[in-house]
Structures are given as C-alpha cells and as structure tokens.
Design a protein with these regions (language model features):
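C-terminal catalytic/motor cores of large multi-domain enzyme assemblies
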Residues: 1-223
Length: 223
C-alpha cells in the first residue's frame, strides 16, 4: 500500500486508452486452443499475444521501456516485463519475465505461466521480482471495461489489459465496401508518467500495439 501511495505522489499519472479489435488473435486462439492445451498443459489466453506486441512496440518507443534514476530517465536496452499477479485478493506481486523482446509467442506464454505459478505457490525469489522495465496488469480476466493502474516505480508506464467482448464492428473489404461483423474487442489502458514523455508519444505507442495485434500473421507466430 505504501508503495502505491508513493507512486501516485512521485509520478504525474496520465491515462491513455485505445480499443483493439482482437479478431485476428481470436481466430488463431480458437483454431489452436485444443492442441495448445494438450501440448503445453495450460490455456492459450490473450495475454502472451499482448506481451509479444508490447515488446515489439517498445523497440519503436524506447522511452516507455525506462525508469527514473533520481531526476534522470534511464532507457533500458532489454525488455524485462513485470506481470502483475493477484495473490488470492490479498495483494499483487509482479514477477519479471526477462528478455521478452528476444522471445516468440510460445516461449512468452510459457514464461508468463511459469512466473505466475511461482507467485501463487509462494516460490518467488528476490531475483524473480527484480529488473522489470515495463509492467502488464491483466484485469481483463475479471471482465473489466477499463482500469487506471498505478505505475510500478521506478518504471514510467504500466499497461492494463482489460476484458475482451464480442461486439459489432464496421469492417471494410478490399474494395472499400463497409459491412457489420461481430468481432472480439477490448481496451488497452496505459498509465504513464508525464515526466518521461508527452501524450502524443503515449498515443503513438498504443497505436503501434493495436496495429501489431490487428495485422500480424499470428498463425505463423504460433507454430
């Protein structure tokens, strides 16, 4: 609790949110979920797709993969992603998946499942909790519409992955014709420190994540 209060008093928190059409991700999840569960022993959720997209976007927007050292912004070379894990509604810990930017989807999913399991069984070491450069918090598992998370100090941003629902959307074909379709849609909400960068930078970062999630060939990625 003291850490959260300190974070709010230290960083001028700003929230930027963007809606994402996850239909491309959902089609791949639906096609592979049975085989994935049999091979890996855990379910294929949206979170590793988001983590993969975030890691790639951080290469283009490095000031989000940063922390404050005193009054100086320190930009990190590696993406070490802290994953907020609930502990029976008694608090959160954020174990770190190291070098996410050097991993593909399947390995990221394995690593997230591993650190979450160690958290819930109280097997974390101090090393598991150190070195994070950016944080994901997955409130969407509870069906949230949009959450305003608190930055994990001394980092400068945290992304809330909120609930995904089936909704009508306007789709445009190759000839420019519009129609209505039912897609899986959700919100990504970014809380960020206004000392580190401005609103345009934060919005462009979210837009890059959105672009990756909506256009990447996830079928090739999952193999």
């Amino acid at each position: 609790a003291e850490h959260m209060v300190m974070s709010k008093s230290t960083s001028p928190h700003v929230l930027t949110a963007m809606e994402v059409d996850y239909e491309r991700v959902e089609q791949v999840r639906k096609m592979h979920k049975g085989a994935w569960k049999a091979e890996e022993g855990f379910s294929l959720t949206y979170l590793p797709f988001i983590a993969r997209a975030v890691a790639d976007a951080l290469r283009d927007f490095p000031h989000l993969n940063a922390s404050f050292g005193g009054d100086h912004l320190v930009v990190h070379d590696e993406v070490n992603m802290a994953i907020a894990v609930d502990i029976d509604f008694e608090g959160l810990l954020a174990p770190v998946v190291k070098n996410v930017d050097g991993k593909r989807l399947r390995q990221i999913a394995r690593d997230i499942t591993y650190v979450a399991g160690r958290t819930r069984t109280k097997q974390l070491t101090p090393d598991d909790l150190s070195g994070g450069t950016f944080t994901l918090t997955n409130a969407g598992q509870y069906g949230t519409m949009m959450q305003f998370p608190i930055i994990n100090q001394p980092q400068v941003a945290i992304l809330s992955t909120d609930g995904v629902k089936r909704k009508p959307v306007v789709v445009t074909d190759e000839f420019g014709n519009e129609s209505i379709a039912i897609h899986s849609v959700g919100v990504l909400a970014l809380a960020w420190d206004h000392r580190a960068f401005d609103g345009a930078y934060a919005a462009a970062f979210l837009n890059r994540i959105q672009e990756i999630l909506e256009t990447r060939d996830w079928e090739a990625e999952i193999r």
